[in-house]
Amino acid sequence: IGAAHSFVHQYRFAVPETVDKAFVPRAMSYILLLGIVSALLASNSANFFKDLTDTQFTGSFLFLSITALIPILFLFFYTDEKINIEKSKFEFNRINSILKNPKIILSIVCGGVGYYVMASIMTASSLFLHIFKEFTIFETSIVIQLHIIGMFLPSLFTGDLIKKFGHNIIIVTGVLLLFSSIFINIFFQTYLGYAIGLILLGVGWNFLFLCSSALLVVS
């Protein structure tokens, strides 16, 4: 499941190869927007299949493993573009000069930090809410669903915001949203507080992740 998840995130870099640079942010937004399906499917399936076997949650992981295989069916119909080998070697040899580009450094740092903060809080939240705060699996799954919706629903307009305000403004906004999420989760430890905090966490991640990805491509 982890390996499949890591590869799925690379799909957003395949899209810019087939569209104009001006359309890159919006095209990548469409890819991330499909993640909204996971908010409706994954959380409910985890609760539905958790008692499928004697060991709790084994059924949930089996179901997710099956869903991870679905993209293979679509990839059979994907035709890769021909790559100029000489050009690829030339670009690879210039990797050091490429990394001197401040925009590329900014995109790597923002994407990495944004994902680290989001993944750390999201992963800990599900355990914290269910085990320490003693919310039910259903209540916990609702909070996680809201978080995932916050992660992907903004993709409807994030691409347009990037085109209108630029990469830097959206990156700063994403950072402020992450700080707001941390503040709310620390000082408003109620069910509603956790829900709002995780929604802001998702939106902040979306701004940082999508903006850094688009910035990396156009740089």
PLM features per residue range, with description:
Residues 169-184:
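Structural signature of the two symmetry-related core transmembrane helices
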